[in-house]
Amino acid sequence: MSEQRSVSVIGLGRVGLPLALCFADRGLRVLGVDHDHGVLDSVRSGRMPFMEAGTQGLLERVQRSGRLELSDRAADAARADDIVITIGTPSFS
């Protein structure tokens, strides 16, 4: 990615996307990875794919900063210094 510290977040759901946005807002270069092209298209167009208080403004700010990159390829995550995996887990209830 660059000389600036970077992190990849795999899974841009209700945990991963807000986390990725917070990392980017704090100055990290972030690669967000998700297999769902609907999610990626929504984020690229500046729209949150779900309702979460405060995240729409955060997404807009992060997009202006240029610190968020998106990919549908999990292998791209290896370019970052650190990787966080936030994928759904099954419910046993």
What are these regions (language model features)?
Residues 1-93:
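Structural/interface elements that position substrates and couple domains in central-metabolism enzymes
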